[in-house]
């Protein structure tokens, strides 16, 4: 089974449990806390990925981390399950899938807006409002600046790309001129 399929299966199960209890946001925060601890410590990552450490030692370390973070029983049990089934190395992908499912559940999209020049807040708000009206969902916009675009904006929503950059327009003109 592919890593992506594994991640989606575990993430979907945790989102369903969170949705039943109204704790999806809480679970998301707790998963982020835990992954932050792992990402901040190469030695912890090494321990959990090294088969030389026994499962009991890993369980004790995991239990200690979960206690210090004050994780809910559901998230703690979920992490314990991942450890038992040797799925902890997939945690970053699981968290990414979890957040995606949670966004779908709550009607949130997270597009990326890339512009050639820094945009004013009023322009960002106008684009955000347009996206909200077009999609009917809450928009959490990530804004980036890429000077290579020269001007205009590129908006990415999931797999869809809306490219209104001058760079792309110039490339199209160049292509037309070359073809004659």
UniProtKB/Swiss-Prot annotation:
Pfam families: OSCP. One of its GO terms (cellular component) is proton-transporting ATP synthase complex. It is a peripheral membrane protein. Keywords: ATP synthesis, Cell inner membrane, Cell membrane, CF(1), Hydrogen ion transport, Ion transport, Membrane, Transport. The keyword Methyltransferase does not apply. Its main location: membrane. InterPro entries: ATP_synth_OSCP/delta_N_sf, ATPase_OSCP/dsu. GO terms for molecular function: proton-transporting ATP synthase activity, rotational mechanism. F(1)F(0) ATP synthase produces ATP from ADP in the presence of a proton or sodium gradient. F-type ATPases consist of two structural domains, F(1) containing the extramembraneous catalytic core and F(0) containing the membrane proton channel, linked together by a central stalk and a peripheral stalk. During catalysis, ATP synthesis in the catalytic domain of F(1) is coupled via a rotary mechanism of the central stalk subunits to proton translocation. HAMAP family: ATP_synth_delta_bact. F-type ATPases have 2 components, F(1) - the catalytic core - and F(0) - the membrane proton channel. F(1) has five subunits: alpha(3), beta(3), gamma(1), delta(1), epsilon(1). F(0) has three main subunits: a(1), b(2) and c(10-14). The alpha and beta chains form an alternating ring which encloses part of the gamma chain. F(1) is attached to F(0) by a central stalk formed by the gamma and epsilon chains, while a peripheral stalk is formed by the delta and b chains. This is ATP synthase subunit delta.
């Amino acid at each position: 089974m592919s890593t992506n399929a594994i991640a989606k299966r575990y993430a979907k199960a945790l989102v369903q449990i969170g949705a039943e209890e109204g704790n999806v946001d809480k679970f998301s925060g707790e998963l982020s806390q835990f992954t932050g601890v792992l990402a901040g410590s190469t030695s912890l990552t090494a321990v959990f990925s090294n088969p030389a450490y026994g499962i009991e030692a890993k369980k004790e370390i995991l239990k200690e981390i979960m206690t210090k973070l004050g994780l809910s029983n559901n998230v703690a049990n979920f992490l314990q399950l991942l450890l038992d089934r040797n799925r902890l190395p997939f945690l970053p992908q699981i968290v990414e899938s979890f957040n995606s499912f949670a966004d779908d559940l709550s009607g949130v999209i997270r597009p990326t807006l890339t512009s050639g020049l820094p945009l004013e807040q009023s322009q960002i708000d106008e684009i955000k409002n347009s996206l909200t009206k077009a999609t009917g969902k809450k928009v959490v916009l990530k804004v980036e600046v890429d000077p290579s675009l020269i001007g205009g904006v590129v908006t990415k929503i999931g797999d869809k790309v809306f490219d209104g950059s001058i760079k792309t327009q110039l490339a199209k003109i160049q292509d037309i001129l070359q073809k004659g």
